[in-house]
Amino acid sequence: MFTTVLSEIRQNRNRPLFVLVADYIDGDTLDDVFSWRKELREVGQGESFDVLVHSPGGQLTACFMIARLLCRFTGRWEALVPQIAGSGATMICLGSSNIVMSEISQLGPLDPQVASKKREKFFATERQSPLEAFEALRYLREFAVASLDALMEVLTDRGIAPQKALETSVEIATNLVKPVLEKIDPYDLGAFSLDNKLAINYCKEVARPPDPNRKTQRKAFYKSLVEDYPVHEFAIDFGEAQAINLAVSQPPVDLEVVFDKFRVIASKIKSYVGLVPAPPDGGSQ
């Protein structure tokens, strides 16, 4: 049933179709894609081919390498996203000339999921996001300033001299946030910052390669994918994708019908990587 739906998508688009379905993109996924290099080079000699991407994301470097490989095989390819291409899978789509996505489809921010380097971790769970650490610091800063302002107002209203009121307010506001700040390791924050910079550089390399003949998402605001969204789970739908200047289009009605079929069965498929065979009647290669 799954391969039948993939064949329908290929026939509808009338061009070669490479499929990348993974519940988590890692080094093994990269190896699977690389194993198709001969076939991808052959189809890449044509005008264009499609890559169907269905994944919530995965390892940053593995996703980057997959994106670079796809762009080496052809100067132009289009991404098909029937449902989800989140996080690192979104970065892969930056290598496309266009992303075909439904109203229900979603991309996602590139929020690197990293591990704390210290034994006693700041986060209780294994999943650790730089956004969470930076948001915690932002909240503490805003809380400290708000507390300082409120204390100054109370103390000056009670007739305390401004200098003394300021000293007292600073001391109280500092003591309020100090217990939390002491649990944040600057080393972790530095590591998180480096991971964010790595994500931005990877996005730039994929979206804006040195070769001007490669048709990629050159106009996309790729930094927004790393810096501008509040949480890792933020859904970048069709409208939001347009807002960050991604080249996107919606599928025609007949292709949307096939996408509907794909979404019904996609949750049952953990991994599928490879080219969809050409139709037996000798259709498009």
Where are these regions (language model features)?
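Terminal-region recognition feature
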Residues: 1-285
